[in-house]
Amino acid sequence: MFMGEYQHTIDAKGRMIVPAKFREGLGEQFVLTRGLDQCLFGYPMHEWKQIEEKLKALPLTKKDARAFTRFFFSGATECELDKQGRVNIASSLLNYAKLEKECVVIGVSNRIELWSKVIWEQYTEEQEDSFAEIAENMIGFDI
C-alpha cells in the first residue's frame, strides 16, 4: 500500500528519484500513465494488469469507454528504476502533468501520483475546505 507525500525534483533529463518507501511496492517494472486532475498515475505491474482487464471489459460501443481507454492507454509507459532509484519520465507525460523541476509524489493506496508542486498546492488548498463535505457525500464510507 502506498501512502504519504514527498517533495522531489526532476532533473534536466526528466529523471526523478522515486521515494525509497515506494520503490519496493512499485517493483522493478511499473507503469506511469496520464491520471485524472492533471497528475500522473504510477501502478505496480500486478495492479496495472487488473486495471487492464477491467478496461478491456468495457463495451466498445460506448463512446466514453473508447475515449477513456484511448487516453489512458496511449499515455502509458512501462518504466524501470535505475541503480540510483530514478525513473525516466516520458516527455509527453511531463508535458501533460506540467511537471518541471519541483514535484510532489503521493501514495494513494494502490498507486502513486506525481504532481506539479504548484498544481498540487492549488488542488489541496481547494479540497481542504470541502474535505468534510466530500466525506459526508461518499455513500457507505465511514472512518
Swiss-Prot record:
Example GO molecular function: DNA-binding transcription factor activity
InterPro entries cross-referenced by the UniProt entry: MraZ, MraZ_C, MraZ_dom, MraZ_N, MraZ_sf, SpoVT-AbrB_dom, SpoVT-AbrB_sf
CDD domains assigned to the protein according to its UniProt record, in alphabetical order: MraZ_C, MraZ_N
Pfam (any one): MraZ
Cellular-component GO terms for this entry: cytoplasm; nucleoid
Knockout or disruption consequences: No visible phenotype.
Annotated signal peptide: none
Keywords noted in UniProt: Cytoplasm, DNA-binding, Repeat, Transcription, Transcription regulation
Subunit comment: Forms oligomers.
Family indicated by similarity: Belongs to the MraZ family.
Protein name, entry field: Transcriptional regulator MraZ
